[in-house]
Swiss-Prot record:
Pfam families named in the record: SPRY, zf-C3HC4_3
GO biological process: proteolysis involved in protein catabolic process
Signal peptide: 1-16
Gene: RSPRY1
InterPro entries to which the protein is assigned, alphabetical: ARM-type_fold, B30.2/SPRY, B30.2/SPRY_sf, ConA-like_dom_sf, RNF123/RSPRY1-like, SPRY_dom, SPRY_RSPRY1, Znf_RING
RING-type ZnF: 527-562
Localization, UniProt: Secreted
CDD domains (UniProt xref): RING-HC_RSPRY1, SPRY_RING
Organism expressing this protein natively: Macaca fascicularis (Crab-eating macaque)
Identification of the protein by name: RING finger and SPRY domain-containing protein 1
Residues of this chain annotated as glycosylated in UniProt: N314
GO cellular component: cytoplasm; extracellular region
S-S bridge residues: none
Amino acid sequence: MIVLGWAVFLASRSLGQGLLLTLEEHIAHFLGTRGATTTMGNSCICRDDSGTDDSVDTQQQQAENSAVPTADTRSQPRDPVRPPRRGRGPHEPRRKKQNVDGLVLDTLAVIRTLVDNDQEPPYSMITLHEMAETDEGWLDVVQSLIRVIPLEDPLGPAVITLLLDECPLPTKDALQKLTEILNLNGEVACQDSGHPAKHRNTSAVLGCLAEKLAGPASIGLLSPGILEYLLQCLKLQSHPTVMLFALIALEKFAQTSENKLTISESSISDRLVTLESWANDPDYLKRQVGFCAQWSLDNLFLKEGRQLTYEKVNLSSIRAMLNSNDVSEYLKISPHGLEARCDASSFESVRCTFCVDAGVWYYEVTVVTSGVMQIGWATRDSKFLNHEGYGIGDDEYSCAYDGCRQLIWYNARSKPHIHPCWKEGDTVGFLLDLNEKQMIFFLNGNQLPPEKQVFSSTISGFFAAASFMSYQQCEFNFGAKPFKYPPSMKFSTFNDYAFLTAEEKIILPRHRRLALLKQVSIRENCCSLCCDEVADTQLKPCGHSDLCMDCALQLETCPLCRKEIVSRIRQISHIS
């Protein structure tokens, strides 16, 4: 009876699998180029929660391969816009795992198509994240990132950061195992010098982990061997991109004070002084190294006797620059205020110091890195939500040009443009015509059709503005030097009409800025939000009165009790 029952079960299961395969074959034929039958499409996302063993998967995969021609499968690329399935129905077959290296390369291939913050991530990313939920899987993902990300792809380091940032935090055992596998030291840094991608990727991984694990875990990760490895990568014999990411990794390790002291004691500042001279190098890789070296010498690894850059830079001809008081927290701005770089995992943004309300205006940007940046125009109402991935062009008060993904951004929606992908050294022009209510974008002098949609929300109060993905950098020209591709129509420049006092031009290093904040004395009756004006306003109906009128007018609910604000009453007697 048991044997008979088992035979009936096997027969029914075979029939069910046959029907399922037939159904999948018809679905695959129906979906066609939408990628239902591709390896990347629906075969690599997650594991079934049932207790079925892997042998069933193998049999099912063989049956599927015989039912669907291999050539057909390979010829149909996955539609990157189609949202992946996240859930699994009761009869849905288990998604099969792909080779880790293939998943990493698939993610790199489709990363340019991720243009919506609410868009589901690609199948490959979801699978990698699932794999990384175990120590063994996390180690496989990290080693694959080091092994297969190519040197020439401008988004390679950003993909490393993106994948590791979204993966679960590694355990202490996983970190220990990783250091044992890598076995880094000065000698390892000298090996495979003809293949710098491995060293670049290793440094990028270390930097991402240092940023993500700031604190005791970061201290434990910076072993003597890893410190020796990163310092060796800074030597002039190394490839510039290896030097760049080794320096960025050291910067991120230095976010923990104990690591900062350890790195400073290694005489790193002596090496950085040499690299600082590359800040204006015509080679754009060396220029990035020089920028980061100068920033580190000014902000992190101070050298005794060295004058800080802001104290000696000549700003006499500069009347408009990037605003160090109107910027998200992790963006690096050069001492002359015309160059910016992001090395954080967030989407950092900045506006310039000059606002325009009428007329025709133009500025240019030199592309130093060819990755994702959104550059254009924004009003004061445009919000910088760096940790949520929103920047210029992601609300109704800004419009941006994206030369990497070849898109125009407005109100968090994008549309393609006909310019080729930008590359290092390209010049992007930005024309704002407030008379005709239009914006025109140029790439090396070639213009696109005008953009007008932003003027449905605002017609004045525009600033030059930009947002940067990880490891991106560019230089702005607001008219302090001749433009490379001036437009044919008559226009004005910021530098001709703006004015900044000598004090307003100073971009202080972070340690100097913190020192000034410590000297600020706060009055007892000051506003609890701005700490500047007197707290002279009472909120009704809750009755709290710790705010000034300017701050109170910007709030809809009380910051103390969260009750809705119905009215605001100025208390004249509180003014002193």
